[in-house]
């Protein structure tokens, strides 16, 4: 996603938990596409002051670039392959905080800037929620929450000329195979 925007000449704010990955991405994208990249370590997680973490990212973005045109929420961490019966609260929290809460906090913090620029929000959900993939309960729950949040934001923010959309990538599953055969 970052590469696609960089190819179009967009300056970027990249967030993540791993400083080295952020630094590597910054160096590669700036060198290859001649854009400016602001890497910010940020982790929305249980027990953290998540609103302050996100506000810090948004402040750095505004201080560096002066505006926000597009917000893309694509982050998600989860324990994959763990059944509902075996899931721990900590594993469930990991998915919900890194996905659903992160999208909520970033959308809330970016709203005034997106309103100014009549910008866009692109949130990522997943076919895992649509199809109920085995061992994906927390991931699917977070992604389905993001779908709902996105629909509400599209309704509320449309009057402010903010375009809000959801992308639901699908992995090939047995359910899709059965659907194709039907």
Labelled PLM ranges:
Residues 1-13:
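Canonical Rossmann dinucleotide-binding motif of NAD(H)/NADP(H)-dependent dehydrogenases/reductases
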Residues 10-24:
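Conserved glycine-rich Rossmann-like NAD(P)H-binding loop of the short-chain dehydrogenase/reductase
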Residues 82-84, 88-93:
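Substrate-binding pocket helix/loop in short-chain dehydrogenase/reductase
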Residues 85, 131-137, 159-160:
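Active-site loop immediately N-terminal to the catalytic Tyr-X3-Lys motif
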Residues 107, 142, 150:
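Active-site helix of classical SDR
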Residues 112, 155-159:
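Alpha-helical segment proximal to the catalytic Tyr-Lys
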Residues 126:
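Residue(s) in the substrate-gating loop at a strand-loop-helix junction
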């Amino acid at each position: 996603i970052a590469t696609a925007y960089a190819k179009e000449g967009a300056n970027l704010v990249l967030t993540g938990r791993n400083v080295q990955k952020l630094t590597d991405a910054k160096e590669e994208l700036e060198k290859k596409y001649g854009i400016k990249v602001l890497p910010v370590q940020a982790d929305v997680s249980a027990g953290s002051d998540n609103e302050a973490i996100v506000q810090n990212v948004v402040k750095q973005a505004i201080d560096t670039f002066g505006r926000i045109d597009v917000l893309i929420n694509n982050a998600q961490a989860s324990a994959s392959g763990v059944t509902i019966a075996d899931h721990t609260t900590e594993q469930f929290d990991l998915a919900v905080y890194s996905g659903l809460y992160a999208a909520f906090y970033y959308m809330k913090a970016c709203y005034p800037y997106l309103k100014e620029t009549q910008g866009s929000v692109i949130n990522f959900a997943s076919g895992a929620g649509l199809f109920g993939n085995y061992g994906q309960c927390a991931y699917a729950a977070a992604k389905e929450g993001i779908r709902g949040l996105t629909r509400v934001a599209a309704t509320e923010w449309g009057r402010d000329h903010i375009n809000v959309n959801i992308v639901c990538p699908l992995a090939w599953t047995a359910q899709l195979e059965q659907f194709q055969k039907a």
